[in-house]
Each structure stands twice: as C-alpha cells, then as structure tokens.
Amino acid sequence: MRKLFYFFLIICSITIAQVELKHECSREGSANRWLNAKSTLTENQDKLDISYYGIELDIDFDSEIISGSVIIEGSIGMNQPDSFEFDLLNNMVVDSVKYNGEVSTFTHQDDLINIPAPLAAIPEGYDFSVTIFYHGSPEYCGASGFKFDEHLGIDHVWTLSEAYCARSWWPSKDDPSDKADSVDIIVAVPSNPDFIVASNGILQSMTQSENKKIYHWKEIYPITTYLVSLAIYPYTVWYDQYISSVSNDTMTIENYVFPDRYEGSYSNYLLTKDMIALFSELFGEYPFINEKYGHADFRWGGGMEHQTLTSMGGYSQNLIAHELGHSWWGNMITCKSFHDIWLNEGFARYCQALWVEYQDGEEAYFSFMNNHSYYGGGTVYVENPSSNSIIFNSSLSYNKSSWVLHMLRHIVGDNIFFNILRSYASNDSLAYNVASTSDFQNVCESVSGLDFDDFFDQWIYGDRHPHYQLSWWHEGEGIYKVNIDQLQSTGYFSMPIDITLSGSQGPLVQDTTIVVNNSGSTQIYEFSGLDFLVESVVLDPDGWILKEISYTTAGINNIIANKISVGQAYPNPFNSGIRMDYYIDPKIGDLDMTIEILDINGRRTQTLINNRVTSGFHTVFWNSNNNATGIYFIQLSAADFISTQKIVHLK
C-alpha cells in the first residue's frame, strides 16, 4: 500500500569544486578514409541552397558501370561563391558539365567537382542549374555506397549512403544540413531478368522496351542526400494499407521482398500499419502520408531508413519499429550534422522501446531499457564525426541516447513528454528540415517551462553517468535520514531522484515514494511524519536513471532467518522515557521474548517484557524517571536472536 505523508527535508551539501562534464570522446575507430576530410562543407558549398536533384542512371550489371546525369538546382545565399562545388569521388569520371544550360569548364579533383562561378556579381537568391554527366564503377565506400551484389545467384543492386557516401555514386552537396525540396530518380535496367527498381517517393511511371525497363520515382518531400536510395532485384511485391485515425487518410504500404524471405517476413511486416498508427498517435501523423511507406530487402546486416522505403536486411519487430521511427526522427527532422546523430538514432532506438511497451506492457519496457543501457565512457554528442564507427557507436548514439529520452520522460511526466515530441515534430522551423541538439532542447524548455541546461550538459555533452551510494538510519519518533553520495569522478549530476521507503505497520506492508533533487557530492535528506516502521530504502526503484547504485548499512536490523525487525530506540539521548519499535513476521508466529534494560556494566536494571509475544508490529516504552543519568543498553532477545542498542539517559 502506498501512502502519502508530509515530510521535513534537510539537505546538507559538502561544497566541492565542480568538474567540467564536457570532454572530448577518446574513442578511436577505424576511420573510413572517405570521411576523414569530407565531414564538413567547403566554404563555397556553404553558400549554396539546394532545391532539386534530378538523377538519371543507366545500370550495366555485366560491367558494373553506371552512367547518366544529375541535374542540381538551387540558389545563392548572402555571399557569392567563387565556384560551384559538388561532391563526387575521384574514381567516377565526369564527362561534361552544363551551367544554366551552357557547357562549362570544370575540374574534378580531391573528390570535388569545381565549376567556375560567373565573373559578374551574382545577387542574393540567384537561381542556378547545373547538369553533370558522368560514368564509372562506384567504389564501395566502407560499409556504404552503391553495391553490385547477388542474391541466390541473381544480380542485385542496393545503396546505403549514410553518412557521406552519396558521393560514391552521384554528384551532390553531400551533407545532411541542406535538403533538396524534391528529387526525381530515373533508372534504366535490363528487361531480363524481371528487375524491379524500388526507390523513394511515388512511382511516376515504368516504361519497357525490348531490352530496357525504365523506372521513374519522384520524392516530393524534402530529403537529404544520404536518404536517396535504390533497391533493384526481381522482388516479390505485396501491399498493405494504413488507415489513419488521425487524419482518416489512406496510404499504401509497399513491401519488396526476396522471394525466399516472403513467408518469414510476412507476419512481422503486417504489423507495420499498427506501428505507424502507434507512432502517429504519439508523435503526430506519419510524415509522408501522401506518398507511401515500405520495405525493400537488401543484402546488408541491418536496416537503413531510406525515406518512404526502408532497406531491410532482416525483419524482426525491433528492426521494423526502429527504421519506421526514423520516418519522424531522421527523415522528416534530420540531424543538422552528424555531431547530433543521437537525434536520429537515439530516438529510433526509443521507438523500439515504445513498441515493446505497447505490445507487452510496462515491465517489458523497463526490461528493454535495462538491456540497452551503457555504463562506459564517451559523449552522446559526437565530437569528431570522422568515421562511421564513431558516428554510429551503438553504445552512445543508440543506447545511451535512448536513455536520455527515457529519463526526460520521467522528469516531465508522460503528458508533457509526448507533447514535447509532438511539438518537436510539428515545429515550423524544424519539420521537414534539420535540427541540432540545441533546437531540441529549446522545444523541451518551451513545452515544459523547465530549464534543461544541466540535463543536456550532463547527458549529451558530458561523460559517463552517476554512481550513487545510499545509506539511511532511523532518528526516532518517525524520523528517518537518507544519505546519498555521488562517487563518480567525472563531475556531479543534478537529477530528481525517486526514493521509496518501505516497511510495515502491524500486519500491513506500507511504502511511500518521494522525489528529492540531488546535485552534490554528499546530501542528507530528513523525512518525518511516517506512521510505519521503515525496513528498506531504495533509490530509483523503477529504473528511470542511467546509474550505478550501492547501499551501505541501513538503520534497521533485518534478520532474514528469523524475520525480526528492530527499529532504533528514540529519542536518544532521552530524559524521562524512551521507546523502541519492533516487528515479528507472521510467518514465524508467536515468540518467547525478553526485553531488558542493562546498565553500563551489563547488569539488568529492569525487565520490560518477559513473555510470549504475538507476531506483528509492537512498541515497548521504558519510563526512566527513577533511574540515574548515564549510559544504558536496551536488549531484545528471542531464541538465538539478540539485538542490543546503546541509549543515553540525561536529566
């Protein structure tokens, strides 16, 4: 039974020098050579605002060569560039370039296509159009890029361009910070075998000649370069339907599956519409409701959230939920830079937890979070996003990041937490755009009315986690004190903490939970007004904080074997009388018991109880008016159990 009580809270803090929580992540991954020098925009690229890509490719499976063109349209910002620069790896051959319809000179070196800007001044907002004709055999970009592959001996093409590998197969401004407003993707493949080209957005047309099939897909929602994708194979295609309870709109769910995976994936893929419904209820309507959602199998070990058509290397519910979650967190709102990848991956990991909670309940939710906890070093904010291994660190960018949301949820409560997510998803400046950590923090503060500087400094920019040590004792007359130490060496965490005090009142089991604000090395909290004997104190019993916890000696002598609990005698010191609470577990029944007062030499001064005592909660009182001042002992004996406490009598 949970009880509410009034309590008096005293916080005693030891003043210490605060340790700066921000520090550079020391992890060293196997840096992908394509990423070392290409994780930031050039000065000229930063002056361009891209609005459109038109990608047209012809794919030759025999030679493993692609050829075609990309139209790039955009406008000039406040400052005029010296040249127009676009990313394309050096192994690809640029055949020619047109600038505003006219053939232009260019250079292609250091994985950059450089096109001279006009000599005349270009006004702000000036629109430009560049067409780049090129061909080559795409160089596989570490774990990403354009892949000529096979499945069951049949040719298969797939792409995975995150983080910076769109440049391995098509020229672009390859950075997540600048989304094109729309993209056309036109791909020609051989007619035999019966290839299907699956891509982003809506299929506009499929035309077929004797030797070629040409697919035209169009994405009308803003999209960043790494989310543009191709998946090509003689797929088995089947459809499902999502009917929105939010808007009453209907949307097709398209599944492009390897024929040998059809039966294995079918039942889980059927759950997709239920997941869309859940996430739409929690976050707001599915962001690409006017196009589609779907899956395309590919030969890679995980999944990739390509906009409107996730590439799938498996079909577990966890994977489906994770990649679908990216539709809101990663696709509609994309991290502004890969420093902030947690806004994509941590949110998607948390979507897995929300699906587990929906399917299997609260206990399963907490179990999922515990199974995805991380207690090592490093910051959630990626200090140096130079390689995939650093950016996509599963412990930091996925697991610890999901705990940030888990903790935030408990701090503000469910109503405000999901209002934060809905407000974030519908923010006019962020929806279908890009966001940084500070953008998300601003939304959190605006919706909740709270200051989250400490929270984000600790959990996003700071290292590690709190290690709490708790001890407690009974002061007497219903007063208990709880001491919380922070033992970690990386700085002190400022967090609200649930403290649950449990015990008994006669045969009744009682507990109450209070919230304390903790922020220092050592803090002591005093609680009064409890009308039950406290037998245990637990910090964060439900597991809302990513932490380590240790307990030191408690103030109740819990004898597990005999189930006898003895409270501290109170008040102590005393001047006229003292009392002591004790409890006998009903499971062991009545006991022969003696409670005596002994003087400092161990001689019996008075016998308070010497008879058979029933199980349950009891209080014994000693009136000391006829006794001299000094040190005494109150001793309880039952069978082999003896509890002795020192008491001080003053007059």
What is each model feature region?
Residues 394-482:
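Amphipathic alpha-helical substructures
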